[in-house]
Regions:
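Condensing-enzyme catalytic core mediating Claisen C-C bond formation in acyl metabolism
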Residues: 1-26, 37
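Conserved catalytic cysteine-centered active-site region
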Residues: 52, 56-98
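Short, well-ordered amphipathic alpha-helical segments that serve as non-catalytic structural scaffolds
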Residues: 28-43, 67-71, 96
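Active-site loop-to-helix "anion-binding N-cap" substructures in soluble metabolic enzymes
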Residues: 21, 25, 29, 33, ...
Length: 98
């Protein structure tokens, strides 16, 4: 069975200097915010999403290892949908798309 896969939306987290304005916001919180925004821009319902993939490099707390899962659940994606966090250093975002 073949299926067409489409990217309906993309949102990037902000970039800041180490220890500055974004230091009080965890990577999982940022990921949840961009997941919510990507879903809104795509005009789809969270329950219609069947997979979530995030690129992420530097873990600052234990739940960052599950960043994609944390963001998906926080954005209302069903817990039955797989979630994958990719760590390919500088290529993480691109690898997540592929």
């Amino acid at each position: 069975m073949s299926r067409n896969v489409v990217i309906t939306s993309a949102v990037r987290t902000p970039i800041g200097a180490y220890g500055r304005s974004l230091s009080g916001i965890s990577p999982c919180e940022l990921a949840t915010l961009v997941a919510i925004e990507a879903i809104a821009r795509a005009k789809v319902l969270p329950q219609d999403i069947d997979q979530t993939i995030f690129g992420h490099v530097l873990h600052t707390e234990p739940r960052d290892m599950y960043l994609s899962r944390v963001a998906a659940i926080g954005a209302g994606v069903p817990d039955t949908a797989p979630a994958l966090t990719v760590n390919r250093l500088c290529g993480s975002g691109l690898q997540a798309v592929l």
